UniProtKB/Swiss-Prot annotation:
GO molecular function terms noted in the UniProt entry: metal ion binding; ubiquinol-cytochrome-c reductase activity
Residues given in the record as a ubiquinone binding sites: 201
Biological process annotations from GO: mitochondrial electron transport, ubiquinol to cytochrome c
Subunit and interaction comment: The cytochrome bc1 complex contains 11 subunits: 3 respiratory subunits (MT-CYB, CYC1 and UQCRFS1), 2 core proteins (UQCRC1 and UQCRC2) and 6 low-molecular weight proteins (UQCRH/QCR6, UQCRB/QCR7, UQCRQ/QCR8, UQCR10/QCR9, UQCR11/QCR10 and a cleavage product of UQCRFS1). This cytochrome bc1 complex then forms a dimer.
Keyword Amino-acid biosynthesis set for record: no
Protein name: Cytochrome b
Cofactor, free-text remark: Binds 2 heme b groups non-covalently.
Gene: MT-CYB
Transmembrane segment boundaries: 33-53, 77-98, 113-133, 178-198, 226-246, 288-308, 320-340, 347-367
Additional free-text comment from the UniProt record: Heme 1 (or BL or b562) is low-potential and absorbs at about 562 nm, and heme 2 (or BH or b566) is high-potential and absorbs at about 566 nm.
Function statement: Component of the ubiquinol-cytochrome c reductase complex (complex III or cytochrome b-c1 complex) that is part of the mitochondrial respiratory chain. The b-c1 complex mediates electron transfer from ubiquinol to cytochrome c. Contributes to the generation of a proton gradient across the mitochondrial membrane that is then used for ATP synthesis.
Residues involved in heme b b566 binding: 97, 196
């Protein structure tokens, strides 16, 4: 078996990636989220496949087909709620994975980091289109509001929006194409994940100290396979608890009402995992400015390798930047809260302050803190 594992052209690839892969001996549970994201993607593709067997992407039957899945299909309710809450688990793991990368300076592996940003955009696009498919009130109005943002692009904006809609409003053509894209994108994401791993295995994993770990590597299997398995069990337990006990806790009550173009919901808002970006979008009075800020809220991550001023890689031994980091985390939680609030005083002002703070911490304060820490080290 050992000979086959190391010689067979296909099994050899798996062996080098998941079995004999030299891994730092000191990586903590924060390094579990990569494998958990792989598990989330697998769950989403499988549950999505079974949902697609019963779903119809037609405006007149989409809503009732989802109701049919929940009422008449064997365990359809479970598949639907695993898929809906699986998306939430996916984003929780994504945010923790990115947060770990920022904290421990993993963004210095530029190819892997940039691939991760592309993946983040792809997953966000997939989740947005998936939210439109049940064709409830929030699905319809969410799709209308978010796609309409593209009309802010000078000269070609309006034409572009109508091209995406397939008409003069969000309608049958829009739903059909969103379903097609929502189906194909997870497979594209799977291919991108393989590229992400390819880049990662070129450099090897980072570790909590931020030091070179070549002198102290251990094989991935059995040490980290068993560790990842424990993480997977905890993730599945959490997902099952969500899907079975609180299936609609993270959803919007408006989505229990079929889409009606003549009736606008009082507060249009996306799913909870987009609220931070939605708050940044709404905090700028200008439409184009808001769209740019929305894109930059994610794209600013690509600047992190160039804004790294410290002589140390991670934040493990850097108390000033650590403080900045946790203020940034708190700021993102505030933005998430604001994104779900109505557009009125004092929420508008809080959103604007939190949005300015978000970009200021990443672009200005963290690099300055890194330089201050360098000087303190030099003095000693």
């Amino acid at each position: 078996m050992t000979i086959m594992r190391k010689k067979h052209p296909l099994i050899k690839l798996i062996n080098h990636s998941f079995i004999d892969l030299p891994t730092p001996s000191n990586i903590s549970s924060w390094w579990n989220f990569g494998s958990l994201l792989g598990l989330c993607l697998t769950i989403q593709i499988l549950t999505g496949l079974f949902l697609a067997m019963h779903y119809t992407s037609d405006t007149s039957t989409a809503f009732s087909s989802v109701a049919h899945i929940c009422r008449d299909v064997n365990y359809g309710w479970l598949i639907r709620y695993l898929h809906a809450n699986g998306a939430s688990m996916f984003f929780i793991c994504l945010f923790l994975h990115v947060g770990r990368g920022v904290y421990y300076g993993s963004y210095n592996m530029i190819e892997t980091w940039n691939m991760g940003i592309i993946l983040l955009f792809a997953v966000m696009a997939t989740a947005f289109m998936g939210y439109v498919l049940p064709w409830g009130q929030m699905s319809f109005w969410g799709a209308t509001v978010i796609t309409n943002l593209l009309s802010a692009i000078p000269y070609i904006g309006t034409t572009l929006v109508e091209w995406i809609w397939g008409g003069f409003s969000v309608d049958k053509a829009t739903l059909t194409r969103f379903f097609a894209f929502h189906f194909i994108l997870p497979f594209i994401i799977t291919a991108l994940v393989l590229v992400h791993l390819l880049f990662l295995h070129e450099t090897g994993s980072n570790n909590p100290t931020g030091l070179n770990s070549d002198a102290d590597k251990i094989p991935f299997h059995p040490y980290y396979t068993i560790k990842d398995f424990l993480g997977a069990l905890l993730l599945l337990a959490t997902l099952m608890m969500l899907a079975l006990f609180f299936p609609d806790a993270l959803g919007d009550p408006d989505n229990f009402t079929p889409a009606n173009p003549l009736n606008t919901p009082p507060h249009i808002k996306p799913e909870w995992y987009f609220l931070f970006a939605y708050a940044i979008l709404r905090s700028i009075p200008n439409k184009l400015g808001g769209v740019l800020a929305l894109i930059l809220s994610i794209l600013v991550l690509a600047l992190m390798p160039f804004l790294h001023t410290s002589k140390q890689r991670g934040l493990t031994f850097r108390p000033i930047t650590q403080t900045m980091y946790w203020i940034l985390v708190a700021d993102l939680l505030i933005l998430t809260w604001i994104g779900g609030q109505p557009v009125e005083y004092p929420f508008i002002m809080i959103g604007q302050v939190a949005s300015i703070a978000y970009f200021t911490i990443i672009v200005i304060l963290m690099p300055i803190a890194g330089m201050i820490e360098n000087n303190i080290l030099d003095m000693n």
